[in-house]
Amino acid sequence: MATSAAAHGDHAQDHGHDEHAHPTGWRRYVYSTNHKDIGTMYLIFAVIAGVIGAAMSIAIRAELMYPGVQIFHETHTYNVFVTSHGLIMIFFMVMPAMIGGFGNWFVPLMIGAPDMAFPRMNNISFWLLPASFGLLLMSTFVEGEPGANGVGAGWTMYVPLSSSGHPGPAVDFAILSLHLAGASSILGAINFITTIFNMRAPGMTLHKMPLFVWSILVTVFLLLLSLPVLAGAITMLLTDRNFGTTFFAPDGGGDPVLFQHLFWFFGHPEVYILILPGFGMISQIVSTFSRKPVFGYLGMAYAMVAIGGIGFVVWAHHMYTVGMSSATQAYFVAATMVIAVPTGVKIFSWIATMWGGSIEFRAPMIWAVGFIFLFTVGGVTGVVLANAGVDRVLQETYYVVAHFHYVLSLGAVFAIFAGWYYWFPKMTGYMYNETLAKAHFWVTFIGVNLVFFPQHFLGLSGMPRRYVDYPDAFAGWNLVSSVGSYISGFGVLIFLYCVIDAFAKKVPAGDNPWGAGATTLEWTLPSPPPFHQFEVLPRVQ
């Protein structure tokens, strides 16, 4: 193959056109139209943003380690860290890693496509993100609250705290940052939908697609339908702040609760956007290391479709405390609990996939099993919070923080690490150190559980969220939680060392290091795959 490619290159030079030439050096990445290079840039970006977001969370836990103000003597800065940590982890870590990174890398490979449908649009989808991230970081250095820098309104940006409460320009920077991140995701969503519907290899019907591709398809539909609503909401906030409109200002006939409705109509689909690609990755990994096909493939695919659909009609369960009618609350309680059904289908299908399988506990598999266990814990506390009467007491306490961190910090992040170790040999051609990867898992597992399990107790005791200080009664579990965050931080260092170690030792991985269980198309290609794959489309039986 190399010979024919070289001969073709000589021939093309004679004619002054070489379809196979691609830019090298920095141009290869800055001008990239290659889904693998763009996916790699997304993953590197996600790691950088993730380290920054994790550093902020460790600063938050360092502050809360003891009662009294420890390090945030300008107490507004504590809320800036809370806000930035949330926005960074959601928009610049989880989404770029799962959708931009693994999605770009493996959707074309898994459906037998040569690339994405719109390669140049793919490029700007990525490059909008560093600009967006830059704007968010800039917001922390300009005035927000009077006499203090940065946005301290929480990632939810509730008015009036984000309007009259932040007269400085910081919130405007954050709004423009979110606009760019949203534009990036909408363009990416259009690209994925077009690619998955139009570029599948012959024989690759929708019902033969790998579940990871299904998960990305559902996810990008959620993005396409929910992000424009967020864009509308934050544009209205921008005009309320700068151009005299009163969408959310009661003195002009507006309603601050309208902002919450618009925000959460985006925000609830968003949390499913964060977890659905993880579901897809876990399905591939559990199947691979159990050496058998996923149990209930069609049920798994349509469970994700159902989760995506119902996810759009439950948004006000974030708003039980704003004074909705009992009938409205009753509807949102019931609708929210219905989501537990397709989610349960997925949990039990993963367990059924492992049942009777020839299981091999390599690093990706232990991350996946950890995901299933911890995501289930997070799901159970979610069913608790779905009850409006219970939520009245637990709303804005650490019980809510514990709930969503169990599905995100111990759910989505575990899925990302599972996917990282699963596909790292395919992306790089190098094998990681199994011992380091397992050490990374166990240190992280112990750390994150120490951080977030005690927060359920704090919430049940009534400790509210987003406060820099707290009564002495809450000191014990906060100390445990903060120690856990340092352990988790050490886990991140093990991860970074594991990556450096793999690139230093360069142990060749082979085309398929996982054996007979790995049945999707990417394992038929070399590791790493060629710059252009599937120039002759594969045929799927």
Swiss-Prot record:
GO MF, any single term: heme binding
Transmembrane segments: 40-60, 87-107, 124-144, 173-193, 211-231, 262-282, 294-314, 332-352, 365-385, 404-424, 441-461, 483-503
A Pfam match: COX1
Protein residues bound to heme a3: 403
Location in or out of the cell: Cell membrane
Pathway: Energy metabolism; oxidative phosphorylation
Gene3D superfamilies, sorted: Cytochrome c oxidase-like, subunit I domain
Entry-linked InterPro entries: Cyt_c_oxase-like_su1_dom (IPR023616), Cyt_c_oxase-like_su1_sf (IPR036927), Cyt_C_Oxase_1 (IPR000883), Cyt_c_Oxase_su1_BS (IPR023615), Cyt_c_oxase_su1_dom (IPR033944), Cyt_c_oxidase_su1_bac (IPR014241)
Enzyme class: translocase
Cross-link 1'-histidyl-3'-tyrosine (His-Tyr): where in chain: 268-272
Chief location: membrane
Disulfide-bond pairs as recorded: none
Catalytic activity: 4 Fe(II)-[cytochrome c] + O2 + 8 H(+)(in) = 4 Fe(III)-[cytochrome c] + 2 H2O + 4 H(+)(out)
Protein function: Cytochrome c oxidase is the component of the respiratory chain that catalyzes the reduction of oxygen to water. Subunits 1-3 form the functional core of the enzyme complex. CO I is the catalytic subunit of the enzyme. Electrons originating in cytochrome c are transferred via the copper A center of subunit 2 and heme A of subunit 1 to the bimetallic center formed by heme A3 and copper B.
Name recorded for this polypeptide: Cytochrome c oxidase subunit 1
Species whose genome carries this gene: Bradyrhizobium diazoefficiens (strain JCM 10833 / BCRC 13528 / IAM 13628 / NBRC 14792 / USDA 110)
Gene that specifies this protein: ctaD
